[in-house]
Amino acid sequence: MAVKIYKRTTNGRRNMSVLTFDEITTSTPEKSLLAPITKTGGRNNQGKLTVRHIGGGAKRKYRIIDFKRDKDNVPGKVTSIEYDPNRTANIALITYLDGEKRYIIAPKGLQVGALIVSGSEIDIKVGNALPVMSIPVGTIVHNIELKPGRGGQIARSAGTSAQILGREEKYVLVRLQSGEVRRILGTCKATIGEVGNESHELVRIGKAGRTRHLGVRPTVRGSVMNPNDHPHGGGEGKQPIGRKQQMTPWGKKARGIKTRDKKKASTSMIVRRRNG
């Protein structure tokens, strides 16, 4: 998908860019696969703020995506490629031979009219989903399950992918884009190909208003807050933070501290840590 850069007609338009949406074939979603989505403003069920910088944004409906790809050995035809406001990747509407319709994440190169299928003994073709144990070494995949039947959890964003590196007994080694090498149970499913809409990372938002339309609120520096709001706050005018190192808003060290739980069960599945 190409990127269109606007001319410098105003300060907001200067070097602003948008996707051209050449791959999108319809602007009307499948009504049976829509669900209401309620805005939370970053609050939990107690009304407490749990995620900062969330609020507002354009109204949207959730598209129900088939991450499990559990409709085995039933061919489906790609009916349309659509925009999804809830994710960076595009989605593809699949109509199966028995008449059922489902959305999947649209891989790079998937065209309207193409046939895809899920199963254990099928062709290695873009859009097909099969257990990672059945995928040849070196194949690029996305939408990878961490537990069989739970649905894909890894490599779902625009332009992301992973690569099958090898096999270890009942596990398969997968290298993620971060450089992390991870063991995946061989019965977990993955989809062939990389996620499409890889130009998404090239888009320049250009102005604050576009970010607000996306439902993202402003980020305020801790140094300009009051001391009761942030450890960096307070002082007359511009002041140093007054501490040996940077802190989070909750008073914890913000640099050089590992944030992953040391007792996390899946740590044993990580063969090599991610780069950086």
Swiss-Prot record:
Residues 219-276 are annotated as: Disordered. GO terms for molecular function: rRNA binding; structural constituent of ribosome; transferase activity. Keywords: Ribonucleoprotein, Ribosomal protein, RNA-binding, rRNA-binding. SUPFAM superfamilies: Nucleic acid-binding proteins, Translation proteins SH3-like domain. The keyword Endoplasmic reticulum does not apply. GO terms for biological process: cytoplasmic translation. GO terms for cellular component: large ribosomal subunit. InterPro entries: NA-bd_OB-fold, Rib_uL2_dom2, Ribosomal_uL2, Ribosomal_uL2_bac/org-type, Ribosomal_uL2_C, Ribosomal_uL2_CS, Ribosomal_uL2_dom3, Ribosomal_uL2_RNA-bd_dom. Residues 252-276 have a biased composition (Basic residues). One of the primary rRNA binding proteins. Required for association of the 30S and 50S subunits to form the 70S ribosome, for tRNA binding and peptide bond formation. It has been suggested to have peptidyltransferase activity; this is somewhat controversial. Makes several contacts with the 16S rRNA in the 70S ribosome. Part of the 50S ribosomal subunit. Forms a bridge to the 30S subunit in the 70S ribosome. Belongs to the universal ribosomal protein uL2 family. NCBIfam families: rplB_bact. This is Large ribosomal subunit protein uL2. It comes from Acholeplasma laidlawii (strain PG-8A). The gene is rplB.
